[in-house]
Amino acid sequence: MELIIGIIVIYASVLILLFIFQRSLMYHPQENNYFGDKLEVEIEKVKIKTSDDIDLLGWFHKKDLKKFKTIVYFHGNAGNLENRTYKLNHFKDMDVNFLIIAWRGFSGNLGKPTEKGLYNDAKSAIIWLKEL
């Protein structure tokens, strides 16, 4: 019986620790796997304001908004914009526009990443594009 209680206590403790530290386990804004790739496409650094008044850093590559589709690129849960340089370079020979944004808490942006906040960031990026 003591063994079963011990296992339950350990299991509950692990669950509590996972709950407490879930944000730091899910989001890694300080991770840097940047290898020094040079950006081979011309970008404009943009600021996108969210509805909760956070400025997000973004990179916008515009060829022709009327003629070509626009890709909105959300970089994931780790690192910063520079970590995606090698991926963005694949767009250089494509007839597309693209916008990549850094989430709140990433690439020097204020705020902390949360699910609700990330949805807000994504909506703000799309609204910004529609207003061009």
Task: Spell out what each predicted region is.
Residues 1-4, 65:
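Short, Lys/Arg-enriched, disordered terminal segments
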Residues 3-49:
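An N-terminal hydrophobic leader/cap segment in hydrolases
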Residues 51-132:
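Membrane-embedded segments
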